[in-house]
Amino acid sequence: LTDSLNHLYVRDYQSIPVVVDEGISVYDAIVMMFLEDVGTMFVVDKHALLVGVLSRKDLLRASIGKQELNSIPVNIIMTRMPNITMCSKEDLLIDVAKKLIDKQIDSLPVVKDTEKGYEVIGRITKTNITKAFVALADEGY
């Protein structure tokens, strides 16, 4: 089993990321999260580089107050660097699973390190990892 787990990489199981610009409103982010049916969105700057993560909890917290959600940009409420846990496509799935458990989060951005910052190239979720482990079990590892 250990040998099999050491051959499961993020690149083979990652899914398409849902990214939003740091200037969009909280209201628009709520609509987008609902339409895309995701629990986390990755926030990028004008250079398409990762600057934050936006969770359901962030959006819910913002909507509880009396603020006008159309006038608040998501960069006010998002989790910012360096408090973002991320992974690369070359990481082992088992290591990413451990990060998700340790941080008690549902997904991670898959990033490519560039000279200017981190480019979001995918996402890995608890569901992606569960599918991989179920497939491994079905193969009889």
Predicted feature locations:
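Terminal peptide-recognition signature
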Residues: M33, A48, I77, L100, ...
